[in-house]
UniProtKB/Swiss-Prot annotation:
A Pfam family reported for this protein in Swiss-Prot or TrEMBL: ATP-synt_C
Gene name in the database record: atpE
One GO MF term: proton-transporting ATP synthase activity, rotational mechanism
Cellular component GO terms, alphabetical: plasma membrane; proton-transporting ATP synthase complex; proton-transporting two-sector ATPase complex, proton-transporting domain
Stated role: F(1)F(0) ATP synthase produces ATP from ADP in the presence of a proton or sodium gradient. F-type ATPases consist of two structural domains, F(1) containing the extramembraneous catalytic core and F(0) containing the membrane proton channel, linked together by a central stalk and a peripheral stalk. During catalysis, ATP synthesis in the catalytic domain of F(1) is coupled via a rotary mechanism of the central stalk subunits to proton translocation.
Chief location: membrane
Subunit structure, interactors included: F-type ATPases have 2 components, F(1) - the catalytic core - and F(0) - the membrane proton channel. F(1) has five subunits: alpha(3), beta(3), gamma(1), delta(1), epsilon(1). F(0) has three main subunits: a(1), b(2) and c(10-14). The alpha and beta chains form an alternating ring which encloses part of the gamma chain. F(1) is attached to F(0) by a central stalk formed by the gamma and epsilon chains, while a peripheral stalk is formed by the delta and b chains.
Gene3D superfamilies for the chain: F1F0 ATP synthase subunit C (1.20.20.10)
Annotated site, Reversibly protonated during proton transport, chain positions: 61
Protein name, entry field: ATP synthase subunit c
NCBIfam families in alphabetical order: ATP_synt_c, PRK06876.1
Annotated source species: Wigglesworthia glossinidia brevipalpis
Length: 79
């Protein structure tokens, strides 16, 4: 494989991992803010909100993990 294609693979993997990480960071920030807002409004629902918070945070955090796997696949398997 010539070096231009290899360079494009590295750049595409970096873009995939970078945008997924930025998106997850923004999503977790918004999620945390909404959790605090909901907990401040109705303190008696904190256990329910906390459970839902951690479930959704796990789903949001899974996206960058998948993109890291795809990025590593692009770097090592496709080159």
């Amino acid at each position: 494989m010539n070096s231009i294609n290899a360079d494009l693979l590295y750049i595409s993997a970096a873009i995939i991992m970078g945008f997924a990480s930025i998106g997850a960071a923004i999503g977790i920030g918004i999620l945390g803010g909404k959790f605090l807002e909901g907990a401040a409004r109705q303190p008696d629902l904190i256990p329910t909100l906390r459970t839902q918070f951690f479930i959704v945070m796990g789903l949001v955090d899974a996206i960058p993990m998948i993109s890291v796997g795809l990025g590593l696949y692009l770097i090592f398997a496709a080159s």
